[in-house]
Amino acid sequence: MAKVSAPLDWTDKTYFCCAVTLYGIAMVYSVFLWRKGFQRDDWVVYGVLAGGLVLHTVAMAKRGFNLQACPINNLYEATAFIMWTIVAVNLVAGIWQRFRFVGAFASPLLFVLGVFALFPDMDPELANGAHEFSGALSSLHKALLMLSFGGFGLSAVGAVMYLTQEKDLKMHKFRAILSKLPSLERLETAMTRLVWIAFGLLTAGLIASSAYLHQVKQVWFKADPEMIWVLGVWAYYLVLLVLQKRHVHSGRRFAWGTLGSFLFVLLTFWGVYLLSPLHQASNAAS
């Protein structure tokens, strides 16, 4: 009798491809929710994203066990970690009915990031033993920074929801009444809290990065492109939060600031990473 082989020998990249496919399916279904004005409580996107998270988690776990360290060592792994954070927090928020539609706004971002991460140059093949790890601080500072970017990504999703709801209230009042999206006040509160949490993670990541740099280079700061870039991002979000705290910004301006800042992070992170001598030490050595 012929044996049926189970897909237990799939590579981590195969699991990740399957997860990205599910994110794409969620994105396509989300188009119908957008067109209907989010007037129906729907579990489909939530369920598809949950399935994607399971596959995504398996992919990251397999990569981590193979490396025997936190799997954040190149652009593919960093992108996958950011995506995982966004999906996980989205599913937790989706427990509450009014925030279940966050997935409809997050799925396009997840699909685009997933396709981008699968580009061949994002995950170069290295010889056995090519990875170098320097203990807990190495994994800690990467994890904190990636978690913070995931939090900023979720706040940007909240900003899109806020701007969508605000537009409906102005242009399509009847559709806004029937919509199951949260109120503008709740969305603004959620945005603000997400930015504060992500900012705290970014601050902790900067401290851990400085400690890690001192561990390996005996200096607390180095004029590296990525370090300067992260400090610039930190300063921008600090100003954004201070202005929001003092009620200088309206909810609409805060939403645009949150969305614009994350788009800046999304579009510039990859280039800065490639320009960073600290993160391209292996390439310089070769």
What does each model-identified segment do?
Residues 125-140:
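Interhelical loops and loop-helix junctions of multi-pass membrane transporters/channels
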Residues 65-67, 132-133, 182:
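Residue-level signal for pocket-adjacent positions within structured domains
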Residues 1-2, 286:
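Low-complexity, proline/glycine-enriched hydrophobic segments characteristic of transmembrane helices
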Residues 2-9, 132-133:
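Juxtamembrane membrane-water interface segments that cap and precede transmembrane helices
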Residues 8, 127, 174-177:
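General secondary-structure edge motif
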Residues 11-126, 144-167, 186-215, 222-286:
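Hydrophobic cores of alpha-helical transmembrane segments in multi-pass integral membrane proteins
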Residues 169-185:
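Juxtamembrane inter-helical linkers in multi-pass membrane proteins
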